[in-house]
Amino acid sequence: MDTLELLEKLTSPAGVAGEETSSFESLKGLFSLYGKVSQDASGSIIIEREGNAPHILLDAHLDTIGFVVTEIMDGFVRLSKVGGVDMRTVEGMELTIHGTEDIYAVVCTVPPHLSDGESRVSKDGTCVADIGMSKEDAEKLISVGDKVSFKKSFEKMGENRVTATYIDDRGGIAVLLKALEYVNTDKKITLVFSAQEETGGTGATCAAYNCDADLALAVDVSFATTPDADPKECGKMNGGAMIGYSPALSREYSELLVSLAKEYEIPYQKEIMNGRTGTNADHITIS
């Protein structure tokens, strides 16, 4: 399976933080091709490949951002964000409410004639979505607490790029699966596709504690340079993997990754962080 095909399969199921089981059921067959598969109590997917010491843990998070239903109204539902949703981008977005069946919804927006741009951006992480049905009908299908995902998309851009829902962090999962295809080692490797990264890192914390690995590597997305972004805060597209340097990380392992990249002539970039990384590495280091 080529990388684009793998990525399309991985980005297909939703899996809003706290509801990762649906992703597990959809992808279990695919994951079983890579080793012994299980799901732990936190919802994380664990793939084990037996071997000798040192035991290596490789993490990428399975969960995605989304919303949760907080109120059902006549024709509408009120939603609260789950994870790092950028509320500047949600107006008019198409959603799927995961009730007793999947329900289509569209985020409402106040017309520009009736508001200024600043006042239309939610300050508290909530929004209202149009569901096109009465409250009575809606309550037969939707309950407060139901998770809500973004409408799925996967589109090619140019020759070898894509835009897709949930590349954060299904892209990281794709990287680890492809890496496992190429790795030829007798060392024990555990892949952790962790739950609830978007809401506090619960999955990675539990999995790292249970795995008790000798070393760990967390793979997540980062920022690519765009015309209006500060290039000092971003990586360069096609510039190679971004290797993190942070007080929360092992300097020894960061330098090891750089030396390996140099040895095998693999493009890389350094990502310098002055505190926490904002990834599961923060949670793995204390587990």
Q: What role is predicted for each listed range?
A:
Residues 1-287:
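N-terminal hydrophobic/helix-forming segments and targeting peptides
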